[in-house]
Amino acid sequence: MDYAFIVFLVCFVSGTLGNRRRAKRDVDEVTSGINQLVNQLNNVQQDTAAIKSALEELKTEVSASPSTVSQVSEVVNTVGSSLTKFTSGDAFNIVSGCLDLLSTVASTFGGPYGIAISAVISLVSSILSLFAGDGFDSATRKVIEEAFKTHRDQELRDSVNGARRTFNDVIAFLKGASKHGNVTEQELEVISKGVPLTKLSDTLGILESRINRGSTSTDAAEAERTVEFIFLYLQLATMRDTLITNFILILKQVPAADTYANAVSISLDANKESVRETIDFLHNMEAKNAVCGAYYYPIYHSEMTKSILSFAKFFGLPDPPRNTFGGVYRVQNRYWPTWYICKESYMGNHMFRGCSNVRSPSVQIRALENGYQKINLRGKNMYITKHAQGWAWGTADNDPGEQGYFVFVPLKSGYYMISTKKWPNYFVYMESSASGYIRSWNHNPGLQGHWRIL
């Protein structure tokens, strides 16, 4: 193999990844544009939408030239000084614009931008303080917190996308290098520097931490994002596995690197075990994982979850418990094991409740084309009403809608927690009244919401 050719490849890969720069305009023109925005922000009255609009314009201006990064903090501070004018309004407009700006600064400039970021964080703190009185309710705070989460998550997605581009370049490099055969120790050293395993492992570590937190979250949006991050995590882990495998093949061509090759092989096995441990909860769920599970199951409801299952098999995770059905069953409550789901008619309504000592199966559970399940009892399809802690009612309609598209989350105990496509974080349970009506509970309803399908 030509040593100079390898050096060229490594430099090409590094250069390609490090020099994705945007088109730059004349610095004076950009500076003038930013100064106009500063004046516009100084003249803002009580219209928070105008602030967001100005920040969006700033995003365009500041993207044009890295030399303007020092001016970002000035603009942000200008926005901050305008906050005293606000006595009411939609704080999210301001926060959204600021987070957009922060994202632009982070993605546009490779140099230091800590001052600008600090200024944005300080600004958002000011917003929180400003709206902390009567004008700032918990709903608005939740929106702002969600905006922060979305921003951080987007940074992580961008990191994974960058790693994916790196993988494509490096795997092509490795395959090209291995074709020549008879790799020397000097060439091997160059190849080793071209394989960014540390970078991949760092991103995987961040994703793993994110998954560990999200797997037990009771927040619906957080749980849904966690499933997406599991998909990204498994994609990246597979890329790392592929890189290491190809690297081992090259190491085998160098007699002096045989011990090194064995060590790398051991690390490959350790990595696979670590991935299995991270995603094990998917097929061995506890009640604390149920909200996340309600977005993963039914597995065949989306291409993403089907891909997760394929990746899980690649890393040796056993198949999940039964989570699709097609027949007539008894649905037994865990807390009251002699009670089962049944149905009664009340003032023209068909209400699902608990009945004791049901001897024969009567609940029909059937998979829909979209992967969800439909529950039917004596001609009535069960659905959850939209009332607080909704009731399980029956409808004669063939399509009960998303309120009647059920998710069966399999627990490792052998029981199931049941929610709907409409409200994945609300689970079916049997209330402790004399009638034992079937209702839904936000997050974990306890053993009253665990069901065995017989």
UniProtKB/Swiss-Prot annotation:
Its main location: secreted. It is found in: Secreted; Nematocyst; Target cell membrane. It comes from the Eukaryota. Residues 19-25 form a propeptide. GO terms for cellular component: extracellular region; membrane; nematocyst; other organism cell membrane. Keywords: Cleavage on pair of basic residues, Coiled coil, Cytolysis, Disulfide bond, Hemolysis, Membrane, Nematocyst, Secreted, Signal, Target cell membrane, Target membrane, Toxin. One of its GO terms (biological process) is killing of cells of another organism. Residues 27-61 form a coiled coil. Contains 2 disulfide bonds. GO terms for molecular function: toxin activity. Nematocytes. The keyword Membrane applies. Residues 1-18 form the signal peptide. Oligomer. The fraction containing this toxin and CfTX-A shows potent hemolytic activity. This fraction causes minor effects on the cardiovascular system of anesthetized rats (at 25 ug/kg), since it has no significant effects on heart rate but produces relatively small increases in mean arterial pressure. Negative results: the fraction containing this toxin and CfTX-B does not cross-react with CfTX-1 and CfTX-2 antibodies. Belongs to the jellyfish toxin family. Type II subfamily. This is Toxin CfTX-A. It comes from Chironex fleckeri (Australian box jellyfish).
